[in-house]
Amino acid sequence: MKLPRSAAGWTVAVFGLLALLVGAVGLIWPEALLRLLGFEVLESRASGDYTRTFLTASSMASFNMGVYYLLASATEWRAFYRFTVGFRLLTFTVFSVIVLVDAAPGRFFGVAAWEALGALATAAGLWWDRRGAGAAAPVSAVSSSVDPAGPASTADAVR
């Protein structure tokens, strides 16, 4: 897999790698993930308690999302980067609210903060990349259709 070629790409790659790793931990060692997120680990679960099922589904989603983010960073899919900023801020809002209404432990706010910091880092990376591209290229060459990371590879058919 190719390394990212932009600051925004690196922020997306880091998040993707961490999402993949957290997903793998949840699949392999769910109790560790529950502790990491600030949830109590019970010795036994009551009949009808689907915590483990939900955790497996969430971990698989995190693992898959990590793969998507890594693929986006390897192909410099900048539209995806921009899309993630708004949705990660929405995720921050939802996760913060569930902590504030006591539907999640206070430690879960760390997950919300991680989403906000990731969104802001990617937004800053997009700004930095745009700023650098504008300074390096003549004014007539800079437009919304020009990607500062260079031409898309043939593998990047989703652009």
Where are these regions (language model features)?
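Short, intrinsically disordered terminal tails adjacent to the first/last structured region
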Residues: 136-159
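Membrane-helix boundary connector in multi-pass membrane proteins
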Residues: 74, 80-83, 93-112
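Short helix-capping/hinge motifs at transmembrane helix termini and TM-loop junctions
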Residues: 29-30, 38-39, 76, 99-103, ...
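Membrane-water interface at the C-terminal end of transmembrane alpha helices
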Residues: 116-140
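Residue-level micro-sites within transmembrane alpha helices that shape
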Residues: 87, 112-116
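Core segments of alpha-helical transmembrane spans in multipass integral membrane proteins
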Residues: 17-27, 47-73, 85-93
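Short, Lys/Arg-rich, polar N-terminal cytosolic tail immediately upstream
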Residues: 1-5
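Membrane-helix boundary elements
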Residues: 6-52
